[in-house]
Amino acid sequence: MKRIWIQRIGAAVLCAVLLAGCMPGGPAADSTASADPLTGQEQQYPGQRPAAVVIDNAPGSTTQWGIGSASVVLEAAACADTAPSLCLVYPSVSAMPTVGPVTLGQDLFWRLLSGQQVLPIQRGCDLYTRNFLDYWNLRAVDALETGRNAFTTGNTDWASPLWCTN
């Protein structure tokens, strides 16, 4: 009999402890600054859409611009016989410096970043990438379409354009 009472008292104490843990505490610290979904740090460009640029990473490519200021750098080998491409992600278009050399867009990068609703920036794309962009009704800023309105080369070589926001 005494054992049953001890078990009941133990169960009641356990229930009280568990229910006390569910009660709302004091006032929580209200964070006014939202976190950047790319880095987790304080958001510097609230309400602006992230932008991502695919740049060439081949051994013979020209100097790469803008890598140091990117929030996220993705590297992936989309084709077996080519060098991996780099995808530089920035919190907004206004946060981007001159970036390049811009190269062929890869659907792998756009699939990875689709949850962030990034603005894709590329120089042409293959059939799979075009189908992905068309299916999700995404419009990439393409150097082959916009030309010198958004891109510069600094010389006559249009094969490796630089993204320029100024």
Model-derived regions, located:
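C-terminal motif of bacterial Sec signal peptides marking the signal peptidase cleavage site
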Residues: 18-21
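Bacterial signal peptide processing site
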Residues: 23-26
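A surface/extracellular/periplasmic glyco- and lipid-processing/surface-interacting theme
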Residues: 29-74, 79-166
